[in-house]
């Protein structure tokens, strides 16, 4: 493929980036109050442009290709999770589960330990369940509630959970990315875990220290309401079932049913902060509607990225990056660049590793790259990119649960950036020595 055709195939992505930057600058201008002018319009314009430049295909075929990406199986699964997450979050908030859980956290932890405590909780849960999505679903509503109670930055508190969720996504033995990375690079999970830990654990410790320092100035509310332990039960059950390995959709359904049962039961007993049957239905409906914009963004992202793939954009990236490799360090950098660029184009780190896994193995074997380090590079850089793109599943889900724009969360995502820097230094400085 010629440079012209390859760059044209990728141009919708370039346009999207320009629009996101422009809309972000517009939104932070104090003279403009509508901070929601970000991703929906940006993706609509980029999608129309992507369909328009797809020469050589009739318009119907272009639209079919776009629709295929927008309705892909893995994307639709995420959309159902958005629907259930919105339903659960709104049900829990309306019956007082969020407030009760926040009061419990504030009664146990001093205010200065809230930030590092949230990060450690996200790291622990994500390692236990192997999925960043489940971690975001379980903890973001609590983090957002704490932020409101402590008059802290909601975007920052949400970003702590999103960042910590990638600790487990990167290291957990049951994470999809770990499984795919080790299978494509033909190495043991335990060996990959050792190498990967040497690279990212120091970054996690530094981020934890940073959150500890940032938390020193936080003040707890002067008055903390009495904890209603029954209303904490839905979140407790969600955490336990998620850690036990239950499917995330089943977890959310169970959590929503528990919220309804406790809320309606409290109403029948005359307790305040509860709802009747139709109040529960109304809360669920509002939660689902609240996720509507993010669902549209996710579908438009899937459609546009499918157009890019169909036009040869991903093949162009792979060919260009692998054309000039001539050393072990260069091979490792090319593996990192491959998975990063493809992740930007697919918005799915597991798919990105699957796409470039075999070519990365060939590059690694040719230049003597240790399979364990290659797997660590694939996993770490894919998690870094997935954690920073504003149209990724986890970011959109977190934004919906916290009632924010993804751009409100992005500036505070320290951990994904930290592991990216750590992995890059590991390549440049030949660390760990034994595997370099």
Question: Which residue ranges define each predicted feature?
Answer:
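Interfacial loop-to-helix junctions that mark the boundaries of transmembrane helices
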Residues: 2-5, 27-41, 69-73, 105-110, ...
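Alpha-helical transmembrane segments of multi-pass membrane proteins
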Residues: 81, 112-125, 151-167, 330-343, ...
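Re-entrant/interfacial helical elements at transmembrane boundaries that shape
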Residues: 134-146, 162, 173-187, 350-364, ...
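Core transmembrane alpha-helical segments of multi-pass membrane transporters/permeases
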Residues: 39-44, 52, 63-96, 112, ...
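Juxtamembrane and boundary regions of transmembrane helices in multi-pass small-molecule transporters
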Residues: 163-166, 170-225, 230, 388, ...
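Hydrophobic mid-bilayer segments of alpha-helices in multi-pass membrane transport proteins
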Residues: 8-21, 33-55, 78-84, 116, ...
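Hydrophobic alpha-helical transmembrane segments of multi-pass integral membrane proteins
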Residues: 79-89, 109-142, 321-359, 378
């Amino acid at each position: 493929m010629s440079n012209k055709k390859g760059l044209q195939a990728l141009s919708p992505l370039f346009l999207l980036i320009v629009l996101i930057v422009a809309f972000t600058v517009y939104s932070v201008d104090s003279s403009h109050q509508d901070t929601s002018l970000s991703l929906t319009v940006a993706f609509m314009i980029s999608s129309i442009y992507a369909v328009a430049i797809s020469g050589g295909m009739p318009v119907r075929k272009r639209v079919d290709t776009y629709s295929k990406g927008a309705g892909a199986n893995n994307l639709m699964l995420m959309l159902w999770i958005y629907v259930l997450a919105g339903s659960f979050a709104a049900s829990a908030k309306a019956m007082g589960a969020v407030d009760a859980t926040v009061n419990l956290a504030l009664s146990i932890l001093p205010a200065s330990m809230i930030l590092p405590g949230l990060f450690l909780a996200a790291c622990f849960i994500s390692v236990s369940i192997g999925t960043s999505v489940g971690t975001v679903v379980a903890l973001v509503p609590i983090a957002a509630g704490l932020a409101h109670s402590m008059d802290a930055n909601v975007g920052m508190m949400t970003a702590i959970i999103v960042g910590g969720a990638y600790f487990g996504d990167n290291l957990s033995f049951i994470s999809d990315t770990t499984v795919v990375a080790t299978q494509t690079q033909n190495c043991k999970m335990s060996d990959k875990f050792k190498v990967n830990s040497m690279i990212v654990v120091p970054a996690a410790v530094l981020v934890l220290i940073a959150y500890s320092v940032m938390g020193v100035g936080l003040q707890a509310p002067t008055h903390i309401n009495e904890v209603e332990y029954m209303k904490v039960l839905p979140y407790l059950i969600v955490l336990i079932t998620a850690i036990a390995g239950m499917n995330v959709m089943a977890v959310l359904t169970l959590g929503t049913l528990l919220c309804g049962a406790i809320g309606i039961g409290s109403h029948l007993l005359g307790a305040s902060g509860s709802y009747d049957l139709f109040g529960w239905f109304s809360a669920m409906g509002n939660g689902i509607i609240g996720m509507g914009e993010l669902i549209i963004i996710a579908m438009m992202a899937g459609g546009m990225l499918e157009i890019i793939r169909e036009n040869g954009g991903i093949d162009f990236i792979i060919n260009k990056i692998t054309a000039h490799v001539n050393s072990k360090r260069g091979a490792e950098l090319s593996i990192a660049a491959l998975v990063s660029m493809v992740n930007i184009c697919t918005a799915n780190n597991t798919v990105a590793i699957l796409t470039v896994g075999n070519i990365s193995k060939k590059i690694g074997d040719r230049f003597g790259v240790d399979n364990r380090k290659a797997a660590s590079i694939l996993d770490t850089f894919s998690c870094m990119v997935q954690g920073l793109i504003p149209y990724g599943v986890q970011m959109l889900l977190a934004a919906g649960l916290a009632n924010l724009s993804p751009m409100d969360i992005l500036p505070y995502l320290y951990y994904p950036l930290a592991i990216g820097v750590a992995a890059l230094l590991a390549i440049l400085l030949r660390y760990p020595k034994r595997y370099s």
